[in-house]
Amino acid sequence: MSDKDRITQLLRELEEAKAREAQERCEKERLQLEHRKTTFLEYLRNCHRHLYNALRLTDTSRSSTGYTKVVGKYYPKRLRPWTNFTNVLHPHYFNLVQQICGQRQLFESASTTKNLGTIISDHLAGNEKAIDRFEVDAVERPVQGILKVLATHEEAGKASICPEFRFSANLRELTQKDDGSSGADDNTSDRSLERRQQAGPNKRPTSKSKYICSNRQPDGVGIRMQPDGGQTQAFIYDYKAAHKVAIEHVRSATAKEHLFHEVVARINDDKLSRDEEVQHREQAEAFIAMALTQVFDYMITYGVSYGYVAAGRCLLLLYVDRDDWQTLYCHPCLPADDVGEPTNDWTDRLSHTAVAQLVSFCLSSFQSEALEGQSLETALSVAKATLKTWSESYADVAYLGLEPAELSSAPSSQNTDISEYTSKAKPTGRKVTLRSCKPAAVLPQGNEHDEHDEEDHSEPGASRLAKRERGPSSGGKDDGRSMVDPQPTRQYCTQACLLGLKRGKDLDENCPNVSLHRFDGSSRHPVNAHSFTDMVEQQLLLSPYKGCRMVDFWGKRGAMGWLFKLELLPYGYTFVGKGTVEDRLNRLEHEGRVYARLDHLQGDVVPVHLGLVRLDRGYILPGLEFAVYMMLMSWAGQTPSANMDDAETLKSESLTAIWSEGVDHGDNNRANYLWNAERCRIMIIDFDRAHLFPPLKARAVSRLSKPKRKRETLNSYLTEITGREARHVFKQMDRSPMATPSHGG
């Protein structure tokens, strides 16, 4: 090889080495870029490209079929574009989040998002359950991650735009069948509803039975944390199979102001076009109208102004103004159309991604307070007088589709009898405007609405609501909604106070309300346990909201009920009630029997049990449920702090105490073990799943030859307790005088 050839070869090798080095450097940078955290805009791009676009739909012939059951549910009179979200709210919040996040790398890496997208693409989505999984992974999880960053950011915190937040899909717990014998406690309203809606003695279903709704349980709810630690609903959402909200018809359907009237009329008349293309469009419109109706009904009955339908390829973001119940505002979110194909620079289109729009939707909803208790009942009374339920028709739109000749021949009674469709509420009640759902003052909500009742017995809740309208008003005769029942605001009475009331002993001077309990300078309680329960029941019979409020619907609910704070107004006794629905009375009665077994442990190991009362009208709950029974108790305390070192030891001591009385708690949920500062110990609550057995009396235990046999007796119980707890129970048992063999024969 000549020198010239040698030089040429060396130069070529040098160039190749440089190229390899450059390639390795690029690959290293690419990997670093893939694995580093991302900025806000990068994260939106990755979520759309790798998650949203990963959705694969099954063939429609293999998809789930059937209509959404909406008969008996409220539906709006008008459907209008939510232009205030499109033009004001979304641009404002998108720019605000972009400003707060800036170029900081706060979100998960591109490689993590890609890996999740691969998992999503491995599964075909053909039903609501599959869409549920997709929405959680591709939309809800990223949205919650972005909101979490905002909640911890100082600027956002000062503006109070973003509290702690979570998506929750655990709404069906109270209607699901319990294990074992408690299965008899199932809510029977669905079965009775079906029976009421069957036609004739032969029990044949009506022609509309496929549309009949059986419950008001949405797929999910957006939960926000309150400053006091409570949790309230911000919005409601529901999943729909992608083929039930056909994206090719979404824009045209949601642009129809009288979509609901058209669909209801077609279904009532049982008429479909013979043209196959028109028939397909009409069926798509029916699916969309029913999906919107379902969420609209949830929004009304759960007391929120915001909701959305998630159907994989699209989101339908919804809003209702409490000053205009008959109008539903809708913003269709179609990312595939609005974002389009990926390009080098998506910046101007990233605001149209599903994640970006749902973030703005959530932030908008946080500026509105959910209605509850008395305000929810008032709102539902207005809704019942204003709205129609599927498949009733609104009077003034019933003939929109008729020709003049047909209109003149229509029954005159339907044109002139306006009273049937106007509010039956007292005129004075209209003077009070319900709480506005407008965002902060700096964000004008705009004028979304124009200037421009038959009782439904298909739902148990609706029937009870009608009863409330006929019953006495909690606010007086002249201004039914202008007066609000007094709410309990005092500190809880002490265990010693309420135990003294129950036992007929002296007042507890350490009770924060003792001055209200004392009459004529006496040291004794002014009432006994029996009269106390009677007076509480009479107070709640006058109004379920008088001296009573729900503590925390989402955070303080158990397997069968909710927690209420109550005050017996003349005497200042302040305590709690465990409220439940009609069909769970036997569970409360069973719990009362458990408290009776634990009588001498009340006020120390378990709360003081003060009896059971019935609320004739019921305390309204989100979703048109009613708490009609309450078990009255002393306030047990708070969840032990995470840094309480001896919490498990104290818990085991309390478990040992109730076991010795013949009670197996049966529910090891940590929420059932509360720290009581007054007694300096863990108190146990919620005995609806407890089992009773003969108590371990000292004489019976003395016949055991050795403590080991008692350990065997406890074995089944201790299998549900951690090893450390079990060892402590044994240690306590060995130290107990009951465990010492008797030498007296």
Swiss-Prot record:
Region described as Required for poison activity: spans on this chain: 491-745
Biased composition (Basic and acidic residues): 188-197, 466-482
GO CC terms, sorted: cytoplasm; nucleus
SUPFAM superfamilies, alphabetized: Protein kinase-like (PK-like)
Segments of this protein annotated with the region Disordered: 173-222, 407-487
This protein's record includes keyword ATP-binding: no
UniProt keywords, alphabetically: Coiled coil, Cytoplasm, Nucleus, Toxin
Localization per Swiss-Prot or TrEMBL: Cytoplasm; Nucleus
MF-aspect GO terms: DNA nuclease activity; kinase activity; toxin activity
Entry keyword Cytoplasm: yes
Ranges of compositional bias, category Polar residues: 208-217, 409-422
Gene Ontology annotations of biological process type: meiotic drive
Function description: Promotes unequal transmission of alleles from the parental zygote to progeny spores by acting as poison/antidote system, leading to poisoning of progeny that do not inherit the allele. May possess DNA nuclease activity that leads to spore killing, and a kinase activity that confers resistance to the nuclease activity.
Protein name (record): Meiotic driver SPOK3
Organism: Podospora anserina (Pleurage anserina)
Top-level taxonomy: Eukaryota, Fungi, Dikarya, Ascomycota, Pezizomycotina
